[in-house]
Amino acid sequence: MAIAVLRGGEDLLIGRWGVLVVLAGLMSGCGNGDTLEHFGGPTMGSHYSIQYVRHSATPGPKAVRAEVEQILADVDRQLSTYRSDSDIERFNALPANSCQVMPDPVLELIRVGEQLSSQSGGAFDLTVEPLLNLWGFGPQSREEKVPGVEALAQVRQRVGHGHLRIDGDRLCKDAAVEVDFNSIAAGDAVDRIAARFQALGIDSYLAEATGELKAAGRKPDGSAWRVALEAPRDDQQVAERVIEVDGYGVSTSGDYRRYFEQDGTRYSHAFDARTGAPVLHNLASVTVIHPSAMMADGLSTLLLILGPEQGWDYAEKHDIGVFFVLRDKDRFVTRSNETFERISRGKTQ
């Protein structure tokens, strides 16, 4: 995630893969006594950032920070693929025909993954980690390269959401599959934070983790939370579009920061589980606006995998607000649907 401080009217620039950035002027307060508090720190190998409006009935930043960091610690303990003692990595280490008791939040994410896998015809899949490792993009990767046919066929036997099942409070598998929640974990963390804020009486906030975010309410001066969608460029950060967000999660997935080239072909980290290989279409990035940050997170990945035609049709069918950036020879072109435009203008109907 790229992070920079702007010197000027807007103070904070945050992005994931350089695709999604947040712009929010940090104010000390207004005459009504409300103040805009902000803090952040490391999480999930990246960064999180919180801004919220504090008034007489809401807790101070020290208490709120403790709540947020407890949530992030829970997410890390449950979902991280970079620590061997996490719930999901202990499950991943089990052989075929094994089961493990899982916390309810983990089982709920498995259900979400099953839903997205089914609706995408198997293109989206939470069990692609062995493929990511094989191609050089995963947590146990050694080298970025196109794998051999035999190696790919062998690994694909351990990929597929159909190998998973939930049995009461247990997650079970009939093959040595490995689950990777990276496509929805950060969005899930943001939703957990948003739910906790609601319980604490915090109704105006912008919560962001590794670039996934949700915003609600208004800043103390009455202005909206503003989110900038960055043009997909490797060399610098340039805002493609600035939108206002209230009550929605926003997520961008792009294919242009993590990739390698071999024999004249460009391979990105966006994997189609149906083929076992990276996608090769011209869709560079997808931004999704959704009431749930977790669903925005997962759907932006799903639509990027499906590509410019199938992804667009999926978004229209399911009334999902989307903003596409596509490659057109040596330039980029953008496309957004009516749902995206309506929501980004602050209209819900």
Task: Tell where the protein language model's regions lie, with residue ranges.
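Mature catalytic core of soluble alpha/beta enzymes
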Residues: 2-8, 13-15, 23, 28-349
